[in-house]
Each structure stands twice: as structure tokens, then as C-alpha cells.
Amino acid sequence: MKFVMILIAAAFVASPAVAALDGAALYKDKTCNACHGPKADKPLMPNYPKLAGQNAAYAEQQMKDIKSGARNNGQTAAMKGVMHLVNDEEIKAIADWLSKQK
């Protein structure tokens, strides 16, 4: 029995299950929809960017730059306050989801 448990544990460690993050759910859960709209195509304010259809790599880098402070202007003040809630994997998932929206 001990041997079986060791085999199960070894198999679990050897094959890490990487669950795909749900970009749509993260977009909502991280409150992106509050300013950029439910589908990222109708921002709350005219000066907020439409994110639907944005290039994934560009969107990912912009979010990372806002989070790190590398992009720091008047437009980023509100986002800076919430980006600490989003990790790099979640940023990538959100950016990928945004790129697939129309």
C-alpha cells in the first residue's frame, strides 16, 4: 500500500496539471469591466481605451507596465490601484481573452 501511495504522489508531482485561466472570468473578477465595459468594447469614459481586439502582447505589456509603474501618467492612476490584485499569469489570460473580443 505504501508503494502505491508513493507511485501516486510521484505521478502527481511529475505531471503538473496547468489549468488554463479563464480570461473572461478574470476580467470580471478583477473589476476591469467597471471601466472598460462588460465586453471591453464600450468604456465607461470616452478617454478610457477600448480593449476588445487589442493585440495580446501589447495589452499584456501595458498592464505589466502600469503595475510596475513604468507607465505612469494620468490615465493609469485608477488602474494602478487595482493592478496589485492581478498576477502575471492572470494578466496574460486577460490579455489573451481581450485579443479575441470584437
Where would I find each of the regions flagged by the language model?
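Positively charged n-region of N-terminal signal peptides that target proteins for export
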Residues: M1-M5
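Electrostatic cytochrome c docking/interface patches
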Residues: F12-K28, K42, N47
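Sequence context surrounding c-type heme c attachment/ligation sites in exported
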Residues: A20-N33, A52, A56-Q61
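Axial heme c-ligation environment in periplasmic c-type cytochrome domains
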Residues: P43-A52, D65-K102
